[in-house]
Curated annotation (Swiss-Prot):
It is a single-pass membrane protein. This is ATP synthase subunit b. It comes from Mycolicibacterium gilvum (strain PYR-GCK) (Mycobacterium gilvum (strain PYR-GCK)). F-type ATPases have 2 components, F(1) - the catalytic core - and F(0) - the membrane proton channel. F(1) has five subunits: alpha(3), beta(3), gamma(1), delta(1), epsilon(1). F(0) has three main subunits: a(1), b(2) and c(10-14). The alpha and beta chains form an alternating ring which encloses part of the gamma chain. F(1) is attached to F(0) by a central stalk formed by the gamma and epsilon chains, while a peripheral stalk is formed by the delta and b chains. Keywords: ATP synthesis, Cell membrane, CF(0), Hydrogen ion transport, Ion transport, Membrane, Transmembrane, Transmembrane helix, Transport. Belongs to the ATPase B chain family. The gene is atpF.
């Protein structure tokens, strides 16, 4: 490191001797202007050819993000509208299903009532027919028994008394 410092010091002394012997650090020398000119050229090149494409890409990205955000808002609105439409349609369908179910219950009750009335009528008719048959059979049995009572009573009296009782002769 000592060699490097001595080399720098030697070059500074040579530069001072060439410049006339006096160097003031407040007064700029020619290298400052050369460095300033190179810096301004590099700055101009960067400003002209590097910054515009980067700015363009950033602007495109920002526009794409804004479009995506707008699309997201629009999609959210469409989803909300579709959800509201779905809920409305579902409520209407439930109401319609309820009314159909109520109508079916009423129709079912009417059918049951009609069938019950028909069955009750058939039962009443069957009971009436059976009652009439039983009445006829009872009347027939009664008249048959009444016609045979005289003969049976005479036979029974003959057996009990041991005498032949003829009901025709006593009349």
């Amino acid at each position: 490191m000592g060699d490097l410092t001595s080399t720098n010091l030697a070059s500074a002394i040579l530069a001072a001797e060439e410049g006339g012997g006096t160097s003031n650090f407040l007064l700029p020398n020619g290298t400052f202007f050369a460095v300033l000119l190179i810096f301004l050229i590099v700055l101009g090149v960067i400003a002209k050819w590097v910054v515009p494409p980067i700015s363009k890409v950033l602007a495109e990205r920002e526009a794409m993000l804004a479009k995506t955000a707008a699309d997201n808002r629009k999609s959210a609105e469409q989803v909300a509208a579709a959800r509201a439409d779905y809920d409305k349609t579902l409520a209407e369908a439930r109401g319609e299903a309820s009314s159909i179910r109520d109508e079916a219950r009423v129709a079912g009750r009417q059918v049951v009532d009609e069938k019950r009335a028909t069955a009750n009528g058939e039962v009443a008719e069957t009971v009436k027919t059976a009652d009439e048959k039983l009445t006829q059979q009872g009347s027939a049995a009664q008249s048959e028994l009444q016609s045979s009572v005289d003969a049976l009573s005479a036979t029974l009296a003959s057996r009990i008394l041991g005498v032949d009782v003829n009901t025709r002769g006593s009349q």
